[in-house]
Amino acid sequence: MQISIIVPTFNEARCLSETLTQIQQLSPHQLIVSDGGSNDNTIEIAKNFTEFVIKGPSGRAPQMNAGAQIATGNIFLFLHADSRIEPASYKKMLHSMKNPEKIGGAFSLCIDSEKWSLKLITRLANIRSKYLGMAYGDQAFF
């Protein structure tokens, strides 16, 4: 199984290095950063981690599509630049995708905050995802 991780970016210099460092620890087949017109150091930071840095139209969906067009893996994982995936969760995804009946999925949402409102949003998003099969765009999905 070859995983292409696609990270759409727009002015993500403040958090990108940490995210890409964590992604490298997962040892994906390919890491693609698809930028939507950043005017900070996002592109320079991304080039320190991968040769696959593309500049495309702004907007999350067009950036994700641009990344998917050059992806060579047989599974595409879309992850926001300010997000993380636990190695154990990544391994569960790999195991799950060995089942030929599985066509994709999403990770649970976890917002690192003590605010009750964000905890509520997290809980409701995960309930919606689990029971209705509808993930939010902020969840990593594959």
Tell what function each PLM region has.
Residues 14-18, 40-49:
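Acidic helix N-cap motif at the loop->helix transition within catalytic regions
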Residues 29, 43-70:
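Conserved donor nucleotide-binding strand/loop of the catalytic core
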Residues 35-43, 83:
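A conserved acidic beta->alpha catalytic loop
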Residues 134-142:
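Short glycine- and hydrophobic/aromatic-rich loop-to-beta-strand nucleating segment
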Residues 7-8, 24, 28-37, 54:
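Short beta-strand/loop segment that forms part of the nucleotide-sugar
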Residues 76:
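Short aromatic/hydrophobic "clamp" motif used to bind/position activated sugar donors
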Residues 11-25:
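Short, well-formed alpha-helical segments that are part of the catalytic scaffolds
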Residues 88-117:
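Conserved donor NDP-sugar-binding/catalytic core segment of glycosyltransferases
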